[in-house]
Structures are given as C-alpha cells and as structure tokens.
Amino acid sequence: MVSPSLLGLFYHFYKIFANDIGYNRYGGIFMYIDEIYAARDYIQSRYKNPIDVAIVLGSGLGPLADVINEPVEIDYKDIPYFPVSTVPGHAGKLIVGEIGGKTVACMKGRFHFYEGYDMQKVTMPIRVFSALGIKNLIVTNACGGVRDDLNPGQIVIISDHLSFMMPSPLRGPNLDDFGPRFKDMTDVYTSALRSLAFESAKKVNVDVKEGVYCFFKGPQFETPAEIRAFKTLGADMVGMSTVPEAIVARHSDMNILGISLVTNKAAGLSNNELNHIEVMEAANSAEERLVKLVKQILEDM
C-alpha cells in the first residue's frame, strides 16, 4: 500500500512537471533552446560562411535587401520553428549575402507582439543570430515622430528606449547559454556604432538626428493622451517593434545600432488620421537615402 506521504510527493511533482506552468518553466525553455539551434543549423546548411552583421528591416524598408550581392534567399517558412510574418510590407525572407564589404543576414520582415506571438517567438531570430556567432545587429523601424523637429522622412539614430509597457523578452528561466539573469541596459544602442553612423551620414550627405524610441504593444496606434504622457517622460519617437529585439541582443552581448525612419507625426500632433498605408508610402519615399546610409555604415564598420 502506498503511504499518504508518498502520494503527496507524487502529486507535488505532478503539479510541477505535468501542468502548463511546470511545462513552461522546466520543459518549454529546453525546447526553445533546441528550436534556436535547429534554426541555426538549417541556416548554416544554406550559407556556410561567417556572417558579420544581422539587419532587421521594418515596415516598408524591405528594399534595402534588394542591394545585397550574390544573395541566398531563405523563406522563413523553411527555417525550423521560425515564425512567419503576417504584416503588409514584411516579405518573410532571410537574405544572406554581401553589402559594403560585409557579409550580412538581412531579415526582410520581422515579427511583432501584436501578431499574437509571445516575446520569445518575436525575438527568436536574434537568438538565432547570436547562435550563429553574429556580433553586430542593425535594427530598423518605421515610427511616429513625437519631438517637434522629427517630421515624416527624417532618419533618426536611436540613443535609448522606453520599454516598461511590455512584458520583458527575458522573462522566465534565463538562457544561460546567451547571457546572465540580470543584464545591464545602460548602453543598449552601442555608443561607438551611434558615433560611426553620424560620421557615415556626413559622408553620404544624409541628414540624421538622434532620439529616444518608445515601444507600444499595438496594433492600435497610440492615443493623443498617451503621446502627451510619454513625451513628458522623454519619448521622441513611438513604434511597435525594435525594443524586444534590442533587449535580447544586448542580453547576448551583441553590438546594436537602431535606426528609425519617421513616417508620420504621432497621434494628436497633426490633422491626419493614422494608417498603415501612410507608413508604407513614407518608408518607400525614403528608401534611397536609407539604403545609401546603411551601405556606408557597413563599409565603415
């Protein structure tokens, strides 16, 4: 006959390992790491050379990938466990090749929290890039301008971010293979790369400014009241991406350069109704300047 104490012990372990919480805490994290390495191995099977820089392209900014020399195109759907882009303007391809003398892995389309993915899936590509040994990340986005001098068409180098309205992508058991439990976020956007970006911009005569990017979960655009509140807190731009990726890249000790393209004034700062078509059109109109800038940055890195 089984003693009550043994039954109690069995029930304790059942609760830990069999229910959803126990699965996510003790089992899911190991599966996630396996998925990262499976995705890495597949990409390495398609492109065997070392990669210098990973680039994440935001809404309407996909044409930058079109200037890659000798491109190897990999559909996201073919990469094991990779999410799939669902947003217009995000093609859903990883393109590996050469720009400006550097070997790059360029994400033509990214993933957002508002698409229904959890933060681990949203940031999985960054984990895969780290597992590939990539040390440098350029992350771009289309954003709303909050600061008075940030009008549509302006390119902005991200100096810092506000992120407290989102669940941290580092939440849950720590991925010790990638970084420590508690990571310093003082210099998320690497100061040396920010300085380099300004020097590169001068060389190609592209006007750039610097600002603080504020993350909103979306998919709805921000309200005028939210914009007023976050402007008071120091936000210069607002958007629905970039920050989760930057946090995970920083956790993995990658060098990070964030580039925002202002595609509209934020809510309440103009008479125009906000819509995604406007974002795409503004991004497309700035394509030539952004491509020129990023190519020069890559040459100078």
Predicted regions mapped to residue ranges:
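Short, Lys/Arg-enriched N-terminal segments with co-localized hydrophobic residues
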Residues: 9-30
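Metabolite-binding pocket within alpha/beta catalytic cores that recognizes anionic/polar moieties
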Residues: 31-185
